[in-house]
Design a protein with these regions (language model features):
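Conserved N-terminal catalytic/coupling substructures associated with nucleotide/phosphate chemistry
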Residues: 1-107
Length: 107
């Protein structure tokens, strides 16, 4: 039996209060609201490169990471700290963004 990748195990849980799937990052202000929402509650994870139905599409460029970084720096006060990890799953890259509980607000 093939062992499940940790990201596949997260995806299998489906989206919930602490887990959100994003096909892509196209709007820094919108992502800032998501970062802020996670930070102001119990924290959470964003999986970038995963469609709402759980299918892995993969991230298309380094730009995804930089848009998240820009969202935190430009649109949240104080800046929301996050950790990002790139995972290779079946030849596609998924960007996992972990946001810990942290009181802030989005602009």
């Amino acid at each position: 039996m093939k062992k499940m990748h940790p990201i596949e195990a997260l995806i299998e849980q489906g989206e919930h209060q602490q887990l959100d799937f994003k096909f892509e990052v196209s709007d820094s202000k919108k992502i800032a609201r998501t970062l802020s929402a996670f930070a102001n509650t119990d924290g959470g994870r964003l999986l970038i490169g995963v469609k709402d139905n759980g299918n892995i599409s993969g991230v298309r460029s380094e730009e995804e990471y930089y848009m998240i970084e820009a969202a935190s720096k430009m649109y949240t006060r104080p800046e929301v700290p996050f950790e990002a990890t790139r995972w290779e799953v079946n030849g596609k890259t998924v960007l996992e963004v972990y946001i810990a509980r942290f009181i802030c607000y989005s602009l």
